[in-house]
Regions:
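Glycine-rich phosphate/pyrophosphate-handling loop used in enzymes and phosphotransfer proteins
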Residues: 1-228
Length: 228
């Protein structure tokens, strides 16, 4: 077989579980080894893996802001950011290799179920700007949300801005006004979970959470594939 990440050839080892689930292994041993699942202890707010269960530096900064203390309940992520996930994210996010998303379906569902206990949550993928969506042809956050198996709504509209990756960290951390909202009735008094590919400083998630809370959401949490 050919590994879907490194594209190297390998001999697959089938198990009764993989046969019954019709979920054959499509990753080589080396790539599996470098998939770094986030394990406790973690930051209780953003889910970053660390040596203790106290708030990390970024989350401490968010808690100091009066407009952010009650906006986001928590974030949880599946994998830590490393060289392998950098390559995966690039292929998935920028080259449209959406088949990679299916590789993570089992882990995504397991971590989501373990992290969120509310009944009938609404998933809201972080949107792309119209320009970015036209350029890529798909929104990776919508694809990730579809793996979870809960209702999906798309009431947020991204306002075109310069790329987050080109901004300094303090500029990203304190940015506002990235989104507008439509169709607010569907989220009033609902538990909302934002879905995105990666959580970095939290600026994108917090800004989306703020506007959803202002529109009447009961609570807002977030779930990402990767925590950097």
């Amino acid at each position: 077989m050919i590994c879907l990440i490194c594209e190297g050839h390998f001999v697959a080892s089938f198990t009764w579980k993989s046969l019954l689930l019709l979920n054959d292994d499509r990753l080589c041993i080396a790539c599996k080894h470098h998939l770094e699942k986030i394990q406790r202890p973690i930051c209780p707010a953003c889910g970053r893996a660390q040596s203790n269960d106290q708030l990390c530096q970024d989350c401490s900064m968010w808690k100091e802001r009066p407009d952010s203390t009650t906006v986001l309940v928590k974030n949880r992520s599946v994998y830590a950011y490393n060289d392998l996930m950098k390559d995966v994210l690039s292929r998935f996010k920028f080259r449209g290799d959406t088949a990679l998303a299916e590789l993570f379906k089992q882990d995504v569902r397991a971590v989501f179920k373990r992290s969120f206990s509310m009944k009938e949550p609404v998933l809201i993928p972080i949107p792309l700007s119209k320009e970015r969506l036209k350029e890529r042809g798909f929104n990776q956050s919508v694809i990730l949300a579809s793996l979870i198996g809960e209702p999906i709504l798309q009431p947020l509209v991204k306002i075109h801005q310069s790329k987050q990756s080109k901004k300094k960290k303090n500029e990203r951390l304190y940015q506002k006004g990235m989104f507008q909202i439509k169709q607010t009735d569907a989220i009033v008094q609902r538990d909302v979970i934002l879905i995105d590919d990666i959580y970095t400083t939290g600026a994108t998630i917090y800004d989306a959470a703020r506007i959803l809370k202002e529109a009447g959401a009961k609570s807002v949490s977030s779930f990402t594939l990767i925590r950097s």
